[in-house]
């Protein structure tokens, strides 16, 4: 019963996802590659795992120079310890010399919420990207989060079951 319900929800998402936004995202990613920019993937929790895996796919299958701070546990934990979790990604992006040729791709269920002090690290990274002229892309599970409201091209996974937003968004 659970599997059938889950698969129905996945089908509903596939029917209702904004295909035009997915096409715009693909065009943005191709543009990053064509101008010699780099793609930086950011996410926390399960989305961090998606980032780590996606680095391989974007590099190997798409030919895009791609990185994620998630893949360097030593630096990630040192920055968290010494500078704080809120700036862990923006500090890493500064050292990486994020610039106007580059793009962030945020994987997140909520996308960040300053008022609720949620995923401030993503918000600070987006602010830095905007200040430096880099593009901000996202795949998120909520249309009300910081990423959806401030990104340049953001695919919002249609919410079909509030109780399963996380697994449906991260899947």
Segments (PLM) and residue ranges:
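Surface-exposed amphipathic alpha-helices with a cationic face
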Residues: 59, 124-132
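Glycine/threonine-rich flexible loop motifs
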Residues: 112-122
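Short alpha-helices
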Residues: 131, 140-171
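Generic N-terminal amphipathic, Lys/Arg-enriched alpha-helix
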Residues: 1-17
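Glycine-rich, small/polar surface segments that engage phosphate groups of diverse ligands
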Residues: 30-103
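A short, well-structured juxtamembrane/interface segment
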Residues: 17-35
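Short beta-strand/turn micro-motifs composed of small residues
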Residues: 70, 108, 138-141
């Amino acid at each position: 019963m659970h599997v059938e319900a889950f698969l129905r929800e996945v089908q509903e998402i596939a029917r209702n996802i904004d295909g035009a936004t997915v096409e715009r995202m693909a065009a943005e990613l191709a543009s990053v590659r064509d101008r010699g920019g780099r793609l930086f993937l950011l996410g926390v929790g399960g989305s961090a795992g998606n980032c780590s895996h996606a680095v391989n796919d974007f590099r190997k299958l798409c030919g895009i120079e791609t990185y994620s701070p998630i893949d360097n546990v030593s630096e990630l934990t040192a920055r968290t310890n010494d500078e704080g979790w809120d700036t862990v990604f923006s500090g890493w992006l500064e050292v990486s010399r994020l610039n106007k040729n580059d793009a962030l791709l945020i994987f997140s269920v909520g996308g960040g919420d300053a008022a609720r002090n949620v995923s401030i690290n993503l918000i600070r990274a987006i602010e830095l990207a905007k200040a430096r002229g880099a593009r901000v892309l996202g795949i998120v599970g909520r249309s009300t989060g910081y990423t959806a409201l401030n990104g340049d091209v953001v695919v919002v996974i249609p919410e079909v079951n509030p109780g399963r937003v996380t697994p449906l968004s991260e899947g």
